[in-house]
């Protein structure tokens, strides 16, 4: 059967109804009916062709091939005039390109042999060499390897990272994925989940960004999860410039992973809470840097300064350094606080609590020593150049200051309130995140704190 000079159908037997304009073509056993339309070939055992609407279809299984793909299905339709095809039941699209590996499995697909675009509207799986896509509705261009995906589709990269959202755009060639609405990006290597209202992932650079109620959930400890919020959260690899010149795609082995969050950073974990305006985490050094009025809480202790550096061991802090002014306050009872301040502060941690503290430069201390009956009845004010303190069960076990300098010890019943606090004392408890959800609470007081000038080791900030 021929139609024009571009459509040919080969069969062993044909029946035709003039009233319905339907031709039915059959093949002998061991053979197939073949439709050829330029670079499109369709094969099946029984082929139906409606000349009235220029539409052919099969119901007993068939195969359609063009220059890009092969499509198998139980039921199929093909229109030579529009080049549109419809496939249903056990649909399998396989790329014929030697440079590509692509398989699409679904129960229904619309496909155009000119554009090589597949439209999916039911549960579908798209498998490529560098990842897998799970979707219930989407458009996939098999020629450009670009996809628009809807209804919370899921992209799983070859390294195990995943990206999902209400709407996704994904480019397989570049490894770039963009998500809109309730997005979730999982970094399985670094055990971090990023959530937000908008975000993207770039596989080649192993980089990602989320914004719009952005949240990072870090679960590497296996026992407790860190919840971190900022306006924008970014993760990426750094590459040494000299090594990146030869090949901008390959990633040298000594790269390091970074996470940067800013502004309005707040985080919560059951044993540690904090805030600042900018935070970065350097994976290779296991270092966390907090800038612009950072404050950290651990139980009834509060530490603040201009910069806080925290060293992480398996996501647990083992030491912290405040190189440009540090202040630690420990709430005792009612309006009483143990306080230590200095130009530089270094603390070590053990079992989730502070174990040792060193303070140097302009050291100032206010202490309320506990009596044998567990009461407090006097307050000590001391200044020196250096301080060293050991802690046990979250309480000061030993304290040493040098060189020795005179201090004052005042009974509480004689003490005036102006000696209760060091000049730089501030208690930021109202700003402390108290739950995972509370990290989103950016209060006016926190915004005002971020606008203040840096702390001074001698000047009052009360």
Predicted regions located by residue number:
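Structural signature for solvent-exposed beta-strand/loop edge elements and short helix-capping sites
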Residues: 1-462
